[in-house]
Amino acid sequence: KFSKTIHTSVRMLDNVLDVTAWPLEQQRKEAMAKRRVGLGFTGLGDALAMLRLRYDTDEARAMAAKISAAMRDEAYRASANLAKERGAFPLFNGDMYLSGGNFASRLPAELKQKIREQGIRNSHLLSIAPTGTISLAFADNASNGIEPPFSWTYTRKKRMADGNLQEFPVEDHAW
């Protein structure tokens, strides 16, 4: 299921590039030339907690690395599949893309071979960004991004449409 979700997410993020109303033509050209997307995490800290792994332990770091590697590999596999279907990003050069010293050069051999043969749809695929608001709004209060929960409960201040601040209690649901 994780693999399928990643493939769906990469396809959706690639589709967003095509339907975005870019404010400037220069922005559209840049987006189309590189087709950068940013698949990332929310709730990793809570996932580790639900697996009964303390965030600051070797076991938790090993699990986080395993999850991250699976997400990375499936995202690159999905983008290579999209390249076969829709074409590689216009600036793609396989030798340069897979050369030593960059992120793609550290991919597993089978993925590098797939990219050599099919190309890759998106120049960049992963983004580990802060996801506080997204975690609260769309992930039922999951922990932010790759971070552990800083508190099981806290108060969040939100500016309302009339300009006033209102406080809301927030509870991490993985607890």
PLM feature spans:
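Long, C-terminal-biased catalytic regions of enzyme "large/alpha" subunits
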Residues: 1-175
